[in-house]
């Protein structure tokens, strides 16, 4: 039966598609790089996302961020990206964490539950390690 991931399954195989569907990916920073990563992962069939960012879409994001449109300016990036992911794959689970990753809140994230972690943080002093 054809579904939205049929072409990807032809390329990767059923076992790989099951792994994607059952994987949980944390994306720290959903602006420029993180936005495109989320888009690609959603279109590839990843099942669960944790989106971490405390920034809002602003006018200066329009030239480079996939979530930035005139309609999304002023909205929190994690909420806009959640909506976009669910528009692409309504079966995905999307957990939003409206905060920045900082040393003070590092223990708030269940790193042992993530299959993959994307570090797309734009603050050079703070990176996921």
Region spans (language model):
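N-terminal charged helix/coil linker that caps or initiates catalytic domains
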Residues: 1-26
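Hydrophobic/small residue at the entry helix of a nucleotide-binding pocket
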Residues: 33
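Conserved S-adenosyl-L-methionine
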Residues: 43-48
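Short amphipathic alpha-helix with an adjacent loop that forms part of the alpha/beta core around
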Residues: 104-112
